[in-house]
């Protein structure tokens, strides 16, 4: 007898639980076959769905949605649920849905400090191992927190060592200053929340973080040049919280950002990382489809709709 495909059955139950065809009745959406899956060269731009975009639904739901809507891959936010931290379960989900894992977001957030232990270097090494197992090329990393003194003191050297040892891209994400009720800034990251100032070869641009930091994402694309290795496509304003709005709902002009990426010949991943927390499943699917369409039209993968 064959061993049961636990992740596959979990995915089947997830699909059965979510209705895509009809908002009022459930229906089963089977994953595409190998013959129907679009393949992309390693050097080609990919439009990817972050698993955090389906929260509070599960990582399995992210694969189901990515497959259903036509995303090229999934970026895994490690720590959102148990499956996100299990490379073998992720591999089975990727195979079942025929949607590859293209990036691993290491559990270096404030809310994931105890996922994969508490040693930050062990977390990054484990993220690299997961990426290698799953065939992902990118590990997304947040800068150290101020209280992680030893880690922060050798952060950039350690990132270079990891890249040299693994052959992976460890792309450090831009963050933002924390602000108190009176508007004063709290120093939460070291050496800096601004990844522009870090001596790192590869950076991740998050448009929502740029908005809170009162930066302009288009300018960051230009300033970073070849250091820009990964993009979290979203939107935001300079409010007190990290909003991760849908494209066009904030002040970062994500369309202009994509245009600049195309002008510079960017061939990395454009990852939809938006908040759908307050939405129904039907609304979530529609919002992520609109986000996918927005990106694909701007990068020229689909034609603009006729007016």
Region annotations inferred by a language model:
Residues 8, 20-133, 202, 293-307:
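N-terminal pre-domain/capping segments
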Residues 39, 96, 113-202, 305:
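Active-site acidic/histidine proton-transfer and metal-coordination neighborhood
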Residues 44-48, 73-75, 100-103, 137-140, ...:
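Structural preference for beta-strand elements that scaffold enzyme active sites
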Residues 52-59, 76-89, 109-120, 145-152, ...:
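Acidic-and-aromatic substrate-binding clefts and catalytic sites of carbohydrate-active enzymes
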Residues 66, 74, 131, 170, ...:
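Conserved, mostly hydrophobic/aromatic
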Residues 69, 133-134, 226, 264:
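Structural motif
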Residues 152-164, 266, 281-299:
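Short, electropositive alpha-helical surface patch
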Residues 162-251:
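Acidic/histidine-rich catalytic cores of soluble enzymes
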């Amino acid at each position: 007898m064959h061993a049961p495909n636990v992740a596959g059955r979990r995915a089947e139950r997830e699909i059965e639980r979510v209705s895509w065809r009809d908002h009022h009745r459930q229906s089963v959406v089977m994953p595409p076959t190998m013959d129907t899956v679009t393949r992309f060269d390693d050097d080609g731009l990919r439009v990817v769905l972050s698993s955090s975009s389906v929260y509070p639904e599960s990582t399995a739901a992210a694969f189901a949605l990515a497959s259903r809507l036509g995303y090229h891959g999934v970026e895994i936010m490690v720590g959102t649920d148990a499956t996100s931290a299990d490379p073998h379960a992720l591999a089975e989900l990727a195979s079942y849905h025929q949607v590859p894992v293209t990036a691993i977001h290491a559990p270096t957030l404030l809310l994931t400090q105890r996922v994969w232990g508490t040693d930050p270097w062990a977390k990054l090494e484990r993220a690299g191992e997961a990426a290698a197992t799953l065939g992902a090329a990118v590990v997304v990393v947040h800068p150290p927190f101020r209280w992680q003194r030893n880690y922060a003191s050798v952060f950039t050297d350690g990132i270079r060592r990891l890249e040299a040892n693994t052959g992976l891209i460890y792309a450090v994400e831009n963050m933002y200053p924390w602000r108190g009720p009176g508007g004063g800034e709290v120093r939460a990251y070291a050496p800096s929340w601004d990844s522009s100032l870090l001596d790192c070869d590869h950076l991740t641009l998050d448009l929502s973080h740029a908005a809170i930091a009162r930066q302009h994402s288009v300018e960051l694309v230009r300033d970073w040049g070849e250091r820009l290795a990964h993009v979290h496509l979203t939107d935001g304003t300079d409010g007190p919280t990290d909003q991760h709005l849908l494209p066009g709902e904030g002040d970062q002009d994500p369309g202009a950002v994509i245009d600049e990426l195309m002008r510079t010949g960017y061939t990395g991943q454009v990852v939809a990382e938006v908040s759908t927390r307050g939405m129904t499943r039907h609304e979530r699917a529609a919002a992520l489809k609109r986000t996918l369409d927005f990106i694909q039209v701007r990068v020229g993968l689909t034609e603009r709709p006729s007016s």
